[in-house]
């Protein structure tokens, strides 16, 4: 595994790559290992440069997410949420219920899967909010979630009523 740090407006970001895929992107983590940059990490840093300049870059970085089948499905849905838009945990729970052929699905189960996302920002877990648009649960702190959403043009006053 290769690790390196990226300094961003939301704090230090730790990037992890297996040499072929991005396998981790964590906000606020320090790297105690020797830094090693490969082509995936270099591509990710360029993507982050573009994102933090206010652009909406296409995600063309190979990502490998390790998790349960349920988590994988939730993370796939996260990747479909457009830049600057939000979905509620309930929205994703309803979509998961349809995918799994169930009558309903727990928004809490979805929230737990969202919270385990190992590649934040690129797999945009910050775009998931509470039922009425309230900012809830973000592994890196609600302030960072709010910053990322505002950076993408979202305003809480325009949220779900």
Q: Residue locations for each model-derived region?
A:
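Short, positively charged loop/turn segments that connect secondary-structure elements
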Residues: 97-114, 123
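…primarily DNA-binding HTH/wHTH and HhH modules…
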Residues: 131-161
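Short Gly/charged-rich anion-binding patches and loops
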Residues: 73, 109, 144
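Short Lys/Arg-enriched helix C-cap and helix-to-coil transition segments
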Residues: 121-128
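Basic nucleic-acid-binding alpha-helical/helix-turn surface characteristic of O6-alkylguanine DNA
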Residues: 1-105, 151-161
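Short glycine/proline- and charge-enriched loop/turn segments
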Residues: 27-30, 129, 142
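Short glycine-rich loop/turn motifs that provide flexible caps or phosphate-binding loops at active sites
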Residues: 10, 53, 66, 83, ...
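Terminal helix-turn-helix DNA-binding modules in bacterial transcription factors
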Residues: 117-118
